[in-house]
Amino acid sequence: MLWFFSVRALAERPCRRSPGITCCVLLLLNCSGVPMSLASSFLTGSVAKCENEGEVLQIPFITDNPCIMCVCLNKEVTCKREKCPVLSRDCALAIKQRGACCERCKGCTHEGRTYNSSFKWQTPAEPCVLRQCQEGVVTESEVRCVVHCKNPAEHQGACCPTCPGCVFEGVQYREGEEFQPEGNKCITCSCVGGRTQCVREVCPILSCPQHLSHTPSGQCCPKCLGQRKVFDLPFGSCLFRSDVYDNGASFVYDNCTVCTCKDSTMVCKKKCSHPGVCNSDEDACCEDCLLRVPPEDIKVCKFGSKIFRDGEMWSSVNCSICACVKGKTECRKKQCVPVSSCPQGKILNRKGCCPICTEKPGVCTVFGDPHYNTFDGRTFNFQGTCQYVLTKDCSSPASPFQVLVKNDARRTRSFSWTKSVELMLGESTVSLQQHLTVRWNGSRIALPCHTPHFHIDLDGYLLKVTTRAGLEISWDGDSFVEVMAAPHLKGKLCGLCGNYNGHKRDDLIGGDGNFKFDVDDFAESWRVESNEFCNRPQRKPVPELCQGTVKVKLRAHRECQKLKSWEFQTCHSTVDYTTFYRSCVTDMCECPVHKNCYCESFLAYTRACQREGIKVHWEPQQSCAATQCKHGAVYDTCGPGCVKTCDNWNEIGPCNKPCIAGCHCPANLVLHKGRCIKPVLCPQR
């Protein structure tokens, strides 16, 4: 897509640097979406003229930008700006060539032809050799046939033999129909001419480091997580994983694969053992053989409820790798490379069998009055009192998830606080409310709660929601919210938490897709429209950090001074506390009498230190635990679903409602007007 704009002259005199153009001072109009009519209202001069129709013009400071090209059109200088297309979400390696305007997904060059990523092809000269391009890597391998009968038929011009009939495992398949035998997602069979032909999928070699790859559910081959962005390398060099290889350089990828850098494309050839030596103990590539062994000679291994053929390998429990060797299962422990620390931007992940350095997840924090710290590290304050989109997936029209926050003023004119958090995931709505109350689709629930798509539990003093979509939400039951986004969501999110692309300068992109220069305009653009009345009295401006009496200021600084104490000192050199200190003072200056408003800033700073692997000595349970219920109630993750009140305390009968998490009156007390009291103190009926 091209955007056109004209070039105007402030003074009409010959331009010495650009022949044929009658101006020396040039201004671009309509570069940033400014309407031409509006721009012309405050600019004077005339459109720059030129002589040679159709000539491409070089204009200093304008055409230096590779996205802008100026031509002589109708005797006037007309410039066009290229608008870059959005790259596919499946693109794992985006490159930008020097002098080019737009990024593109890294493809492959092979034998003089160019191929897009994910493209597979075979040539007439080598019909049984499969080639596939995946982000700058061409994987060459033989077509791997799977034969399940004693009398397979060979066909001229076909790579794989076929077996008679289209009945497999008792199921009759139609002509042309494809299926996966035994639920094996790596083998595809098809019914062709009344016979069955089966092929094993060959996984392409990936360009990303191993720790950035994963195998999606229901698929055979791994894919790269997220998207890496690099400049195209000169001299035909290749980027493979985290290393750069010179043009012509070769290396052994594994026992079965040799890779060579050829003109910026890494060509990896997988060798396959001949069927006659498949049973050789020295053959390291036996699992890559064509399975042309008669069924009675095929040795299989049963492991649990699964059947594995000879040579197949699989991961087992307790970090073991198992293999089927001549009908016997052999297992050994995975050998881990010791890792003690990670480079900047990486975090040590100990969740798997072996500790590895992985990309840090994005973290967005909301706390206090409220203060927002985006995924990319931009900090701002916003005191709106409605419901807003904190984050959602903007990479698809129908967002698979979104997180909403609802704010209220809590009887103040200048500030607001986060009152509740709402996670909308598919057909489920999870509400995290005050005092750690949890509702699922409107009903209060007990903890822990497990579903196929999310898990909710109390983690210390925080309520934690973990989703399969890659989001993790922590809530303290008061006004602290932390959203953690997995690296594969990078560049896909939007909302008050920003777009998570690694650059905080463009975090203020509003709900209409336009950049906002004012924080309030940005935040209001993410307001959720509803019929609920959410306005408050006219907002009182706050010209300084802390308005109020001397007593209020002294209390604010006295409480917030603890951030500078020995409890947090071990973290000061790694995480700057000044922003948290200012937020703390702001919160304390209009803090309700019954609240410890410094807690949110302390908690936010503690979490930031913990993410850097630094332990601080501050314990929120001592003075800030949100689980400390008020008016005699106690917190229970599975309290009674039937509430005892002054009206029903002496009724006898079982409670058929499920237990729920939240604040409950102890067994010897009843609830009356929001307080837990003894039954004898109930008013006379």
UniProtKB/Swiss-Prot annotation:
Domain VWFC as annotated: residue spans: 50-105, 108-163, 164-225, 238-289, 299-358
Cystine residue pairs: 364-497, 386-534
Cell compartments where the protein resides: Secreted
Signal peptide start and end residues: 1-39
UniProt KW keywords: Disulfide bond, Glycoprotein, Repeat, Secreted, Signal
Example of a GO biological process term: SMAD protein signal transduction
Residue ranges annotated for the TIL domain, each copy included: 629-682
Domain (VWFD) ranges: 362-535
Example of a GO cellular component annotation carried by this entry: extracellular space
A Pfam family the protein falls into: VWC
SMART domains recorded: C8, VWC, VWD
Glycosylation sites: 30, 116, 255, 318, 441
Complex formation: Interacts with BMP4.
Job description of the protein: Inhibitor of bone morphogenetic protein (BMP) function, it may regulate BMP responsiveness of osteoblasts and chondrocytes.
Name of this protein: BMP-binding endothelial regulator protein
